[in-house]
């Protein structure tokens, strides 16, 4: 991209987790192409630091899972937020950008915007799915929302929030036509025969709820299709131990290969995928594999969620297509027999071909060169701010 200006602009950024660090680093690269003298400060991770970011706190201090953990660390988190707000209010940047972590960043954006600072937010919270009234706070907090998915942008337009759909970075990383045979070779899996990848989730709670059901599904399928093999990627050592314990009930009789991490590679090597709802469903779509999506919560949590949930679907392929492309089996429907039957249908060759075409279309839809699109949108916002400030000074 051609530089817009040589003036030294300053951008405040807060990213709270690894995915935000990755997005932040990509965005910084493209902003520096437009503003070679740009400087960046706030909270960021290793990748952003490599791009010259000045972080006030270690990003890991924001990466907290679960309500109980958040409550335990609340005083520290509030102090960090206050320090960020005070710093940028005292020395206003050209723009402040929150990346994901909405419970932490949107409060900062609101206070800074009230102080007259231009603000943007990168990665929409799931307001379109539940707690939709959050959109009214977001409308007050940001001058611009940058979304990874097109249906999110539609939701903001309906609520008159300035928005730009920039595409999803995963759609650029994952090739349009992944090579199944090469991936099997890389993972040491036999090139012949059918393989199902099984992904019960990356968090302990998910694996506790879905792991036993998924393993019983493997047993159900093995009885009916003894030729099919299974591969389970474990997100980390704790998940691997958990899955190994769950497999013990079958005494090593199931044709299962446990692999450390490499979940995307396992999906590429498979003919079909059984997985928990979440970002993994988007990856499964991008590697063009048929899938069966399962979702299970504790009974009370599910009861609450059912009443709050506004979206028609839970999996990203269905939300993107706005139709039931892939089967979703939720709560009491997620039984070994129902999951097994759905997987057998997904292994059908004709079914696979038609899904591949659908998935390729969706892949192209969200492959927009996200970092470049986001940087251009941010630059437009900065330049608009400059014109407005100049006009105010000139008394126009």
From Swiss-Prot:
EC number(s) given by UniProt: 2.4.1.182
Keyword check for Ribosomal protein: no
Entry coiled-coil feature ranges: none
Reactions listed under catalytic activity: a lipid X + a UDP-2-N,3-O-bis[(3R)-3-hydroxyacyl]-alpha-D-glucosamine = a lipid A disaccharide + UDP + H(+)
UniProt-recorded Gene Ontology molecular function terms: lipid-A-disaccharide synthase activity; phospholipid binding
Residues spanning the membrane: none
Biochemical pathway: Bacterial outer membrane biogenesis; LPS lipid A biosynthesis
Assigned protein family: Belongs to the LpxB family.
Protein name: Lipid-A-disaccharide synthase
GO cellular component terms listed in the entry, alphabetical order: membrane
GO biological process: lipid A biosynthetic process
One Pfam family hit: LpxB
Annotated function: Condensation of UDP-2,3-diacylglucosamine and 2,3-diacylglucosamine-1-phosphate to form lipid A disaccharide, a precursor of lipid A, a phosphorylated glycolipid that anchors the lipopolysaccharide to the outer membrane of the cell.
Enzyme class, UniProt record, top EC level: transferase
Record has Lipid biosynthesis as a keyword: yes
Keywords from the UniProt entry: Glycosyltransferase, Lipid A biosynthesis, Lipid biosynthesis, Lipid metabolism, Transferase
């Amino acid at each position: 991209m051609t530089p817009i200006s040589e003036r030294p602009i300053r951008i405040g950024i807060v990213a709270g987790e690894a995915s935000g660090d990755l997005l932040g680093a990509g965005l910084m690269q493209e902003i520096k192409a437009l503003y070679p003298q740009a400087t960046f400060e706030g909270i960021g991770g290793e990748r952003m630091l490599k791009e010259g970011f000045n972080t006030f706190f270690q990003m890991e201090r924001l990466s907290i899972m679960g309500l109980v953990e958040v409550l335990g660390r609340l005083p520290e988190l509030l102090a960090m937020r206050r320090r960020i707000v005070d710093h940028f209010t005292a020395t206003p940047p050209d723009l402040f950008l929150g990346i994901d972590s909405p419970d932490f960043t949107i409060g900062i954006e609101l206070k800074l915007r009230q102080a007259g600072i231009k603000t943007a937010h990168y990665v929409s919270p799931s307001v379109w799915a539940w707690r939709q009234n959050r959109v009214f706070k977001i409308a007050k907090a940001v001058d611009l929302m940058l979304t990874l998915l097109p249906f999110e942008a539609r939701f903001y337009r309906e609520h008159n929030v300035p928005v730009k759909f920039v595409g999803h970075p995963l759609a650029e990383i994952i090739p349009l036509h992944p090579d199944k045979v090469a991936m099997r070779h890389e993972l040491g899996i036999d090139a012949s025969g059918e393989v199902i990848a099984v992904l019960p989730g990356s968090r302990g709670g998910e694996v506790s709820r879905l792991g036993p059901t998924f393993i019983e599904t493997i047993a159900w399928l093995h009885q009916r299709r003894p030729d099919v093999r299974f591969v389970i990627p474990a997100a980390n050592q704790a998940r691997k131990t958990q899955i190994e314990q769950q497999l013990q009930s079958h005494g090593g009789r199931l044709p299962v290969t446990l692999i450390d991490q490499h979940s995307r590679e396992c999906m590429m090597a498979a003919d079909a995928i059984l997985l928990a709802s979440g970002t993994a469903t988007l990856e499964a779509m991008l590697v063009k594999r048929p899938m069966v999506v399962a979702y299970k919560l504790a009974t009370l949590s599910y009861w609450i969620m059912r009443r709050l949930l506004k979206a028609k679907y839970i999996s990203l392929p269905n939300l993107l297509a706005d139709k039931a492309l892939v089967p979703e089996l939720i709560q009491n429907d997620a039984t070994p027999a129902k999951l097994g039957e759905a997987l057998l249908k997904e292994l059908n060759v004709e079914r696979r071909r038609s899904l591949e075409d659908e998935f390729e279309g969706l892949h192209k839809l969200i492959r927009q060169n996200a970092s470049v699109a986001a940087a251009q949108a941010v630059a437009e916002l900065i330049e608009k701010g400059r014109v407005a400030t100049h006009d105010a000074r000139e008394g126009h």
